Amino acid sequence: MKFNDAAKVLDGIPHISRHSARVLYDFIRAEKPVDCLELGFAHGASSGYVAAALAANGQGHLTSVDLEASREFHTTIEQTLASLNLASMVTVCRELNSYNWFLKKQIEAQTTDDVCAPCYDFVFIDGSKNWTIDGLAFFLADKLLRPGGWILFDDYSWRYADAIERGKTQSDGVSARDLSPDQIDEPNVAAIFHLLVAQHPDYSRFQVQDDSWAWARKAPGTREVKKTGKSVLGSRLSRWKARVSGNA
């Protein structure tokens, strides 16, 4: 499915801008992950763009996980995917209080003789924005991510303090009243990325885009953390290079 065709349907559905959606779509088109996992789908807008890119690739499947509360949203992921005619590209899973329980069950299902066989090429963590939940989610997802795969975090610079200023004391099931002042003030995802992901010996190609998205690849490579903008031109250039090299 072409990007513009997907965008006509998905524009206006929270929570992804068209610019970010283009970067995500082009990443899927260029890297061609087959088995994708999304932790946190809200209304399914980003899920729709991933599914559209997988459909354009001619192969692949997305598993999207969120909380049971997402059934009550005014626009559900099921409605979003149905409007794209891409429901068959996505398996929707819901857990009561955390996608980490889903990850536990996946690790269990993939384990034989005490060894977990990884099963995903791309993991997109876009949920709680909380050190305790997403810090654990990284280590659990790592067990399921194949060598050479990519992991992406949304909300790199998001803070509970900013949400509180907007009058929101609870975010993704976490109450700010249960957090210490320094955890409220510090971007939790940034802490996860720099203290857990960027220090992990199996990861490289660290990139922070627009202080919003944070990428890493499970492969040997440069340890430097680069800060860039979400360049649509750059993603298109990568796609063109892949075509020229015969990998598109």
Predicted regions and their residues:
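S-adenosylmethionine/decaboxylated-SAM
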Residues: A7-P14, R18-A248
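N-terminal, positively charged/glycine-rich alpha-helical extensions of SAM-dependent methyltransferases
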Residues: M1-D5
